[in-house]
Amino acid sequence: MKKKISQAIIKFFKNENLIIDESKLIIEKSKNFGDYSSNVALMFAKQNKIDSLKLAQTIKNQLLSENLNLEKIEIAPPGFINFFISKNEYANIVSEIIQKGENFGRYSLQKKINLEFVSANPTGFLHLGHLRGAVIGDILANILEFSGNFVFREYYINDFGSQIDRLVSSVFSRYQQIFKKFALPEEAYLGEDIIWCAQKFFQIYANKFENSSLDDLETYKIFREKSIEIFLDEIKADLANLSIKFDVFSSESELFRTEKVQKNLANLPFVYKKEEAIWLKTSKFGDQKDRVLVKKNGEFTYFSSDIAYHFEKINSNFKPDFLINIWGADHIGYVDRMKAALKTVNLNQKLDILLYQLVKLFKNGQEFKMSKRMGKTFTIKDLLELVDQDAIRYFISERSYNSLVEFDIGLAAKISLQNPLFLIQYAHARASKLLANSTIVPEKILKFEAENETILISKLKQFEEIVLKITKNYKINLLNKYLLELANLFNSFYSNSKIIGNQNQNSLLSLTKAVQIVLKNGLKLLGIKAKERI
């Protein structure tokens, strides 16, 4: 309905050759002044040299002549327009939801999107920081696909460079400590996961490398490849335990092995040589300064492989219309340089980067602080022992990606209406139980009169708007907020309405069915089970 009203107003302005900025047209949900209201007449009266009340009246007359299923339109000084939806429209909304079922809220946007997320270094178990990126990425992919887009989910394995050297020396040292005293390197990773990995080595190779050294190339190669493999297998297992899937795991080292880094940089414009190093003039395209691609010793920088990786994604067989990268907020310094690199070859429209903030974990009222360097990390494995997958996905996604998440383990595990996820699932279970013991007669005409019914139906219709909004701003938390509001409205309706035995029973059961459908659709997008009973 909101879309219909907007389109009708825009059509009116264009037909009358009046000035309107469509981006500033606002149709707001209203409780006290009709179902929807707009200040469009106030906004554009001056530009069109028309009195705002007169413009509002003209808009009213035009819209009433169109088939918008509006009961009435009222004008309030100095030019507000209030729209009242016809009672028939509420019945139409409920019928539409039931008829479309699991397809209610879908669109057909038809864009190809490469979505890269998680991309954690294979140097240990996934922790809470990685978890947030994983959940955001997976839910966003679900919503983008639900909207009719084609989404290619990609994990970039950073298996090249100094962090891998640190991993190898750390695991090798812990392996040596199984047999004898052996000093840890100064920059060693200190986590329990490194000790675990070394024990895995011992299970596979026994004492084969007891007297070996990393100076031996074959020993180094085995420790490098096996350490990455062991941790990558664990990363994949953790993601699977959260029902998070990928279409491909791409390797940074593979880019170098196949010389794709060199090939992609060979014809890059705005490259110059200075101080025996090779630079890219990113400052010309919005970066703070130019960036080194190849050091004076001939070594490629991380930036060079990142550029090559993005070019590979863009030129892949998938041929994406645009890319989305989901990175931790600590990568903020990389955003401008990466976008600048793509601008050098006119690909700046191809990349959106979401920077998500940290997760703070609270346990028994105390914050559990993480430090991988000191070996104190709270991993996904740890969290899954305390709360289930559904709770993790809900509480990690309930805040905007650019806001801090405070994850309360106690609340997430609580079977109580204080727990927002429990409340939503409780509403779905309530609806399911009622419908399981009742019969809806599809042929009967639906009728909705009570305010709590029409408010609930209006909220149901908003599901479409929420889905579309998320495809534009990527704020998946809007879905959590919406589902909680819908569940609260339904629980109130359920508690304050006599449904079975009501002379309008069939309509109220149909409304309950519509609520069940929308809750289930929304929870499915979050990757959460819609429980039939609690």
From Swiss-Prot:
This is Arginine--tRNA ligase. It catalyses: tRNA(Arg) + L-arginine + ATP = L-arginyl-tRNA(Arg) + AMP + diphosphate. Keywords: Aminoacyl-tRNA synthetase, ATP-binding, Cytoplasm, Ligase, Nucleotide-binding, Protein biosynthesis. Its main location: cytoplasm. GO terms for biological process: arginyl-tRNA aminoacylation. It is found in: Cytoplasm. It comes from the Bacteria. Pfam families: Arg_tRNA_synt_N, DALR_1, tRNA-synt_1d. Its EC number is 6.1.1.19. InterPro entries: aa-tRNA-synth_I_CS (IPR001412), Arg-tRNA-ligase (IPR001278), Arg-tRNA-synth_N (IPR005148), Arg-tRNA-synth_N_sf (IPR036695), ArgRS_core (IPR035684), DALR_anticod-bd (IPR008909), Rossmann-like_a/b/a_fold (IPR014729), tRNAsynth_Ia_anticodon-bd (IPR009080). Monomer. Transmembrane segments: none annotated. The keyword ATP-binding applies. GO terms for cellular component: cytoplasm. The gene is argS. Belongs to the class-I aminoacyl-tRNA synthetase family. Gene3D superfamilies: Arginyl tRNA synthetase N-terminal domain, HUPs, Isoleucyl-tRNA Synthetase, Domain 1. A motif ('HIGH' region) lies at residues 120-130. HAMAP family: Arg_tRNA_synth. It is an enzyme of class 6 (ligase). PROSITE patterns: AA_TRNA_LIGASE_I (PS00178). The keyword Nucleotide-binding applies. One of its GO terms (molecular function) is ATP binding.
